[in-house]
Amino acid sequence: MAVRVLIVDDAAFMRIMLKDILSKNGYEIVGEAENGIKAVSQFQEVKPDVVTMNITMPEMDGITAVKEIKAYDPDAKVIMCSAMGQQATVVEAIQAGACDFIVKPFQADRVLEAVRKAVG
C-alpha cells in the first residue's frame, strides 16, 4: 500500500512541486493545507503516514501545528520544509516534534530521502 502524505504550505507552487516529486515516486497525496489550522484538521481527518510542513504560514505557523498534531497523535511523522534554516529554527522544529528538516530550495532527492526515513 502506498505511503499517504499530507502537504502543508501556504505557497501553492510549493505544494504542487512537492506533490509532483512525491506522486512520481509512488507516494499517495491524501491532502493539502495552506495553513496550520487546516493542517491539524486535515491530519485528524485523513490520518496520513507523513506530513510535509512549512513553518511561516498565516493563521497558525508550522511549529504550532506540529505541536498540535503531536498532541493528537504522538507517533505522527512530520517533516519541516522551510527557507528558515537557521540552527535555532531547526532545533525548535525538532523539539516541537518534527522528525526531519528540509531547507528550501530543496532537491527532490532530499525530499524523498526524508520521507523514506520518516516512514522507515
Predicted ranges, named:
Residues 46-52:
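Active-site beta3 strand of CheY-like receiver
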Residues 57:
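Receiver (REC) domain active-site loop signature in two-component systems and cognate sites
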Residues 12-31:
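Two-component/phosphorelay signaling modules centered on CheY-like receiver
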Residues 84-85:
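Short, conserved "switch-loop" micro-motifs in signal-transduction and mechanochemical regulators
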Residues 106-115:
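C-terminal output helix
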Residues 35-38, 61-64:
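Acidic catalytic/metal-coordinating carboxylates
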